[in-house]
Amino acid sequence: MATATFAAGCFWGVEETFRKIPGVTGTTVGYTGGHFKEPTYRQVCAGDTGHAEAVRVDYDPDKVTYEQLLDVFWAAHDPTQVDRQGPDIGDQYRSAIFYHDAGQEAAAGASRARLEQSGALSRAIATRIEPAGPFWPAEEYHQRYIDKQRARTGVAPACH
């Protein structure tokens, strides 16, 4: 098994996207990339922790590659937006790839370069590529949030 960590806006929708990928064995939403230990959602949203809303993705590399997960990451959000996704504004919604080893760092950089060179985007990529640090799981009510809301109301909430 292997782990990847991505930030691409509101973690509810990002988690939902990765959970659907064959070979992904688990997801955890949480906070990473900041300087505050064991932050709460309220603290992260206040903008004082430096953390991003992120998703830790556990996967079987025999069934899905890190490069394939990177492709999902790029397609799941607008990587040209700085510290936001859609109407969600703040550095907690930034686009970031948190690499866990040198292989992931190289793959993330190469993937970003391919996307930049493709001409598919009209603006510069704002995605940060940073080493993975401590990951603080979000409160339980955030885990699989879209699934929980769909089960409760019959409708999946909108998420950017």
From Swiss-Prot:
GO terms for biological process: protein modification process. The keyword Oxidoreductase applies. Has an important function as a repair enzyme for proteins that have been inactivated by oxidation. Catalyzes the reversible oxidation-reduction of methionine sulfoxide in proteins to methionine. SUPFAM superfamilies: Peptide methionine sulfoxide reductase. Keywords: Oxidoreductase. The keyword Transcription regulation does not apply. The gene is msrA. This is Peptide methionine sulfoxide reductase MsrA. It comes from Rhodospirillum rubrum (strain ATCC 11170 / ATH 1.1.1 / DSM 467 / LMG 4362 / NCIMB 8255 / S1). Belongs to the MsrA Met sulfoxide reductase family. The active site is at residue 10. Gene3D superfamilies: Peptide methionine sulphoxide reductase MsrA. It catalyses: L-methionyl-[protein] + [thioredoxin]-disulfide + H2O = L-methionyl-(S)-S-oxide-[protein] + [thioredoxin]-dithiol; [thioredoxin]-disulfide + L-methionine + H2O = L-methionine (S)-S-oxide + [thioredoxin]-dithiol.
